């Protein structure tokens, strides 16, 4: 990713950066519109995810997470921006005439060929079952349920590692640090997701953040007591508690948020590291 800096003329252009190489020109048969009604609300209209709302209209790109074009070589034609994720996407032209979008693997360029199947080369961008991969392979877009498509390690710069295979299961180290078991028959894509430097970009101004659908974050200590446990007091007052809390009164630091007694508890060998 090439970070482009503008010549200084206003504070927003002075501090902001953009990607000067990747554009967006999606194919009409691989996009569709979505009714933007989220705003962080549930079906009852109650806020369940704070600081969301607004943003520019988006067209959803149909991404091939299943990679079920078996043993048919495809060529990378374009590398495009996707407003629905922080990773880039590639348009693939397959030998049988099929055209699909996939996540852009790090280092892939226009003209490279990819393929998916059971006995394909261990090459960046190729998709194959975990049972056919050697130990230590860097992978992304990993299936949890066979045939459902990749669900793990799909964000920009994400990469997991195959560290063991025993019986019917494979052991993976995920980007979060979690070590868990996956069926060896599940598929994954070789390599790392592209756009590794996404965290190095600077939006430069508040308006760029609002275009992404993200609203301002207000500190609890400047709110009223009715709005937050940290609120209230005369002037600049401390939070008035031994430890910081969430807006709902739960401990804010170190509290585990994962639900208990989930079916996948037995598959997790080591919980994620914070």
Curated annotation (Swiss-Prot):
Keyword field contains S-adenosyl-L-methionine: no
CC terms in the record's Gene Ontology section: chloroplast; large ribosomal subunit
Region (Disordered): 1-24, 223-274
GO BP, one annotated term: translation
Compartment(s): Plastid, Chloroplast
Coiled-coil residue windows: none
GO function terms (MF aspect): rRNA binding; structural constituent of ribosome; transferase activity
Annotated Polar residues bias: 7-24
Assigned keywords, A-Z: Chloroplast, Plastid, Ribonucleoprotein, Ribosomal protein
HAMAP family linked: Ribosomal_uL2_B
Membership in a protein family: Belongs to the universal ribosomal protein uL2 family.
Subunit composition and interactions: Part of the 50S ribosomal subunit.
Protein name per UniProt: Large ribosomal subunit protein uL2cz/uL2cy
UniProt source species: Nicotiana tabacum
């Amino acid at each position: 990713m090439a970070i482009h800096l503008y010549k200084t003329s206003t504070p927003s252009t002075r501090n902001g950066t953009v990607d000067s190489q990747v554009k967006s020109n999606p194919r009409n048969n691989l996009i569709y519109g979505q009714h933007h009604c989220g705003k962080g609300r549930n079906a009852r209209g109650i806020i369940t995810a704070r600081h969301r709302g607004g943003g520019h209209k988006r067209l959803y790109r149909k991404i091939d997470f299943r990679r079920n074009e078996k043993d048919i070589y495809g060529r990378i034609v374009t590398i495009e921006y996707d407003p629905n994720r922080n990773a880039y996407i590639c348009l693939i032209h397959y030998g049988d005439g099929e055209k699909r979008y996939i996540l852009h693997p790090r280092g892939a360029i226009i003209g490279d060929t990819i393929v998916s199947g059971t006995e394909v080369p261990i090459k960046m961008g190729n998709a194959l079952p975990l049972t056919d991969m050697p130990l230590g392979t860097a992978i992304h877009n990993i299936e949890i349920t066979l045939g459902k498509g990749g669900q793990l390690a799909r964000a920009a710069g994400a990469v997991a590692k195959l560290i063991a295979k025993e019986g019917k299961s494979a052991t993976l180290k995920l980007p979060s640090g979690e070590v868990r078991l996956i069926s060896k028959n599940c598929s994954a894509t070789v390599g790392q997701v592209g756009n590794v430097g996404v965290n190095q970009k600077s939006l430069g101004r508040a308006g760029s953040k609002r275009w992404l659908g993200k609203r301002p974050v207000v500190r609890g200590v400047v709110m009223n007591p009715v709005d937050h446990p940290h609120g209230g007091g005369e002037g600049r007052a401390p939070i008035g508690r031994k430890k910081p809390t969430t807006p709902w009164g739960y401990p804010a630091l170190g509290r585990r948020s994962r639900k208990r007694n989930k079916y996948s508890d037995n598959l997790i060998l080591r919980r994620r590291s914070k």
